[in-house]
């Protein structure tokens, strides 16, 4: 569970990026945070992950031990950045996924167990010895997710996870996200392009100019998106029910 109260963040140049955000994210929830570029989405994610310190307000995080992770010691939260290359530090796929659990100080047998589990879950076992620079965009995104999973977080943050991916890669990453949600992980996804994921989320939160404007079930939120510079999904524009990108 994540409880955010009266959250403010100012950058050194004076930009007031977040203005009094109040938001509660339940355990096991799949939450979509959407907003136009510059709305404050990424700032909020970096505050939740602990990369930034809020100017005012608080973030309280409570997370039980996940039962599907193969080890006990791990951080509560993992974040998959928009630019997957910024998270890749190893020469090969296996080395990169090993980096996190090794830095947690896990014994070698636990590192191997965690890495093998994450590689298997993300479908990377067959290319575990492949140099990272030879990976496709979709493979790099899956590698970034595997690197986070190997540390066993209960809560996973995805910042614009479909950015710069082609259609097959988007579908592949989306499938893995759905699997993680089904396994009980709490997922928080930010994007300005809601089309790809909205059919699968539990709730949608809209951020505009640093303020939380609305939050609720997807079907209630689609009619509010356009007034905040967010393109509604095609199914809503056509008056249809929610349609998954995995259909067809």
Q: What is each stretch, according to the model?
A:
Residues 223-248:
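ABC ATPase nucleotide-binding domains
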Residues 191-192:
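H-loop/switch region of ABC-family ATPase nucleotide-binding domains
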Residues 109-127:
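Conserved ABC ATPase "signature" region
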Residues 49:
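Helix-to-loop junction immediately C-terminal to a conserved catalytic motif
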Residues 156-159:
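Catalytic Walker B motif of ABC-type/P-loop ATPase nucleotide-binding domains
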Residues 131-135, 139:
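Conserved ABC ATPase signature
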């Amino acid at each position: 569970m994540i409880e955010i109260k009266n959250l403010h963040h100012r950058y050194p140049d004076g930009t007031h990026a977040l203005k009094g955000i109040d938001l509660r994210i339940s355990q096991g929830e799949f939450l979509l945070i959407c907003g136009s570029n510059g709305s404050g989405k990424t700032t909020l994610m970096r505050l939740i992950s602990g990369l930034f310190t809020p100017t005012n307000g608080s973030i309280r995080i409570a997370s039980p031990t996940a039962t599907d992770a193969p080890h006990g010691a791990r951080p509560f939260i993992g974040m998959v950045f928009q630019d997957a290359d910024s998270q890749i530090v190893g020469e090969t796929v296996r080395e990169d996924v090993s980096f996190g659990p090794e830095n947690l100080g896990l014994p070698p047998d636990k590192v191997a167990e965690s890495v093998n589990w994450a590689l298997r879950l993300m479908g990377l076992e067959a290319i575990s010895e492949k140099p990272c620079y030879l990976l496709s965009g979709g493979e790099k995104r899956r590698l970034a997710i595997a690197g986070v999973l190997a540390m066993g977080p209960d809560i996973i943050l995805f910042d614009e996870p479909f950015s710069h991916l082609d259609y097959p890669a988007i579908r592949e990453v989306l499938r893995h996200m759905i699997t993680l949600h089904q396994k009980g992980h709490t997922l928080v996804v930010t994007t300005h392009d809601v089309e790809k994921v909205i059919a699968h989320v539990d709730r949608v939160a809209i951020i505009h100019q640093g303020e939380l404007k609305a939050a609720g079930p997807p079907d209630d939120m689609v009619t509010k998106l356009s007034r905040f510079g967010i393109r509604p999904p095609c199914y809503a524009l056509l008056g249809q029910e929610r349609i998954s990108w995995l259909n067809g």
